[in-house]
């Protein structure tokens, strides 16, 4: 990761401000500026496992991946650089968490693309750290303020839930389909047969809805769930627990932390990373599935109909079929056979 995002390029216009600062980087860390910016000391906290992977190679223990930051993660920092995400409740969770730990008087810089809604940072932090806009470039805004009052933070207050048939789905800010079942997942679920058996892996599990519905009508299924997002991992664990289902849930960048083979891999793969369109995760899912499927095992994914996945499926497995579709979505199915490229 070498190219800087527009938000980082705006920060670099103010690099002199950070040379003697002890900086905590947090939020939507899309590049490795936290490892490369000239500071007195740098730490980073992220809820995204793939961002942690990149930064950990350069920052070691000075970057931490978790749902909630702790006091040790912000120790000795006198400056917060926060990259605004596209999701306002996610920003609220992260900023209230961080500012409840950081000392009064620290410098706060909030940066983000205008289309992300970064201007709402002013209203969100008005009670705790009044912000002023100090730069505008690359279609981004940069805001600065000082912490005048620590907020109280209760992670439990951010939990939500919704009912799906007889199931309870637990959610957190930043989790895909936080407010209800999305149309793509609904289409994929319509193709899953009752009494499915064997080992099933849900990649990009979100709130755990695919796995929970599958377990509800296939009690003998053995579930493994993974996601890059710490909120998604915790939400999936909570969803399984709320409905009395067992499953192994952990953070993974597609297959990076996955061991073993499965009888079925299911996914509603993301095609955005933050605000940016990215097909990398879905392509890595398709190409990597051959190393994690048993012979005769099945990959079943749902995707927007316009995305170019049929070619990757055919290149990797030798064939694919569309087993359900609407005007917007298609469910693709393929099987692990001898012609698959291992």
From Swiss-Prot:
EC number: 2.1.1.172
Gene Ontology CC entries for this record: cytoplasm
Broad enzyme group: transferase
Keyword match Nucleus: no
Keyword entries, A-Z: Cytoplasm, Methyltransferase, rRNA processing, S-adenosyl-L-methionine, Transferase
Places the protein is found: Cytoplasm
Matching InterPro entries: DNA_methylase_N6_adenine_CS, Mtase_sm_N, rRNA_ssu_MeTfrase_C, RsmC/RlmG, SAM-dependent_MTases_sf, Small_mtfrase_dom
One Pfam family it belongs to: MTS_N
Annotated catalysed reactions: guanosine(1207) in 16S rRNA + S-adenosyl-L-methionine = N(2)-methylguanosine(1207) in 16S rRNA + S-adenosyl-L-homocysteine + H(+)
Primary localization: cytoplasm
Entry superkingdom: Bacteria
GO molecular function: 16S rRNA (guanine(1207)-N(2))-methyltransferase activity; nucleic acid binding
Family the UniProt entry places it in: Belongs to the methyltransferase superfamily. RsmC family.
Function of the protein: Specifically methylates the guanine in position 1207 of 16S rRNA in the 30S particle.
Self-association and partners: Monomer.
UniProt xrefs under HAMAP family: 16SrRNA_methyltr_C
Protein name per the record: Ribosomal RNA small subunit methyltransferase C
Name of the gene encoding the protein in the UniProt record: rsmC
């Amino acid at each position: 990761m070498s190219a800087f995002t527009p938000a980082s390029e705006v920060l670099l216009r103010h690099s002199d401000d950070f040379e003697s600062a002890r900086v905590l980087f947090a939020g939507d860390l899309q590049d490795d500026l936290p490892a490369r910016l000239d500071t007195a000391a740098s730490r980073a906290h992220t809820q995204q496992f793939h961002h942690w992977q990149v930064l950990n190679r350069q920052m070691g223990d000075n970057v931490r991946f978790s749902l909630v930051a702790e006091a040790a993660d912000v120790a000795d920092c006198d400056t917060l650089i926060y990259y605004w995400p596209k999701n306002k409740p996610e920003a609220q969770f992260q900023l209230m968490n961080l500012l409840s730990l950081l000392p009064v008087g620290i410098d706060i810089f909030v940066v983000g693309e205008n289309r992300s809604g970064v201007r709402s940072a002013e209203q969100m932090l008005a009670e705790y750290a009044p912000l002023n806009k100090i730069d505008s470039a690359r279609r981004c805004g940069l805001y600065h303020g000082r912490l005048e009052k620590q907020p109280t933070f209760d992670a439990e207050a951010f939990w939500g839930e919704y009912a799906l048939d007889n199931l309870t789905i637990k959610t957190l800010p930043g989790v895909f389909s936080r407010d209800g079942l999305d149309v793509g997942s609904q289409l994929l679920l319509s193709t899953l047969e009752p009494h499915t058996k064997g080992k099933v892996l849900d990649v990009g599990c979100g709130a755990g809805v695919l796995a929970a519905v599958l377990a509800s009508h296939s009690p003998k299924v053995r579930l493994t769930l993974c996601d890059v997002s710490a909120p998604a991992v915790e939400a999936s664990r909570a969803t399984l627990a709320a409905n009395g289902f067992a499953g192994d849930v952990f953070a993974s960048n597609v297959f990076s932390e996955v061991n073993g083979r499965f009888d079925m891999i299911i996914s509603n793969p993301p095609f955005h990373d933050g605000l940016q369109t990215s097909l990398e995760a879905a392509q890595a899912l398709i190409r990597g599935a051959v190393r994690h499927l048993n012979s005769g095992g099945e990959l079943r994914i749902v995707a927007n109909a316009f995305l170019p996945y049929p070619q990757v499926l055919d290149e990797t497995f030798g064939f694919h079929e569309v087993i359900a579709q609407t005007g917007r979505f298609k469910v693709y199915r393929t099987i692990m056979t001898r012609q698959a490229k291992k």
